[in-house]
Amino acid sequence: MFSLLKMIRTLALLACLCAISIEAFGTVQSAGVKGVLICNGKPAANVKVKLYDEDTTDLDDLLQEGLTDEDGKFELSGKETEITQIDPKLNIYHDCNDESLPCLKKFSIYIPKDYVSEGPSPRKIFDAGTLNLSGKFSGEGRDCLN
């Protein structure tokens, strides 16, 4: 019992030290994305959009989230401190042509690496263009917990 508590305490201390080292030795990086969402030719208002830094070893880091405006427009940006380059992606959660089914459709758009900036504010914003949500997107699935 004593050795188990000692091991848990050691692992907790190690996790804290790792988090501190990332902040101390990592680089602040940022990314941004904008676009317009439509559904059947009309603006898709109040669609949830989230900008993440995709991580392979732990949960993705949420950089910013928001909703499209009445014209279907959105713009998100955010920053994260990482030792390696961040991997930004945009998640879009919608129910275009799908209102009666449970959960929302979800798909991701990966932001090119040349849109990642060093520092707290992105130097350039990735323009995802106009996306018609009535179509099917590669990797599209359903998300009930967004």
Where are these regions (language model features)?
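Beta-strand-dominated extracellular/periplasmic modules and repeats
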Residues: 16-130, 138, 142, 146
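Classical eukaryotic N-terminal signal peptides for Sec-dependent ER targeting/secretion
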Residues: 1-16
